[in-house]
Amino acid sequence: MRLLNILVLVPLLALLTAPPVCAQVTFGSSGAEGDPFRRQQWRVPSPDTDTAAHALLFRPPGAGPFRLAVIAHASTQNGLRRAQMPQPEYRALTAFLIARGFAVLVPERLGHGATGGRYVEDQGGCDEADYVRSGRATADEISLALEDLRKQDFIRKDAAIVIGHSAGGWGALALANADPKAISAIIAFAPGRGGHANDESNRICAPHTLLAAAAEFGKAARIPVTWLVAANDSYFAPAFSIALAEAFRRSGGKVDFRALPAVGSEGHWMIESEAGVKAASADIARVLNLPKPMATKKP
């Protein structure tokens, strides 16, 4: 009887310990185009080959090929907040870019919202914060999404731009070592990691480590960076942001730092609002170096 029980348990144990059979991950469009701006759900590669990152793609009218703008969203070390994060859209910024002939991709990175999966860009606690590793992890995710879209016939193979916000901007700084023919410019809105340490305004987790990481990114930088921060940013205030930008520049990075007027009650989120995009519009337009925008419907 004992032998019979063993014979029954062996295949059962094998089933319980076998690796799961995963459905094949597919990339590309996952829904119809809609409003505004031909809004469409897409799936793009992530560092986890079993997980596709959810993304939104917006396009101007016509067949293209269009220059591509990839918007890299902010993040948080709080796992619950990440899990509850809605799909980022950056509507006002997207409208600004669409009006100037860009296709716009907004991917949601691993460990956030509907994409889910493991949070690969975790920086660690204040005592052991690794801002270089976390920034490079974010850069890898941005790069995977960008390269996947560049395979599409309606996207140009050159002159893409990356616009990063907060942690997304930090990843964009790490991506400044990419081919400048593929990515012509980076715009970073209040880039950084570790802001609002313990949810306290104007407190940064391991600021000296963050400064050293900015210098590390600057060493290999090849793409010019426009660094924008609002006067009332309580995550990375202008004084500290200037120090970060200088660390990046002194080690070899090319950076144009601009302090913008206060926007709303918290300037760190300026780029998510129409007022913030308006405040930054001249600087963004200068980076894009484009003629006057085409007429588009308001989102």
Predicted stretch roles:
Residues 72-74, 229:
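The conserved beta1-alpha1 loop
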Residues 185, 191-250:
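The feature captures the conserved acid-bearing segment of alpha/beta-hydrolase catalytic domains
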Residues 25-63:
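N-terminal cap/lid segment of alpha/beta-hydrolase-fold proteins
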Residues 142-210:
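Primarily recognizes the serine-hydrolase "nucleophile elbow" in alpha/beta-hydrolase
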Residues 72, 107-109, 189, 260:
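Alpha/beta-hydrolase
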Residues 64-66, 75-114, 237:
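Short substrate-entry loop that stabilizes the transition state in hydrolases
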Residues 251-299:
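C-terminal catalytic histidine-bearing segment of alpha/beta-hydrolase fold enzymes
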Residues 124-153:
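Alpha/beta-hydrolase active-site loop
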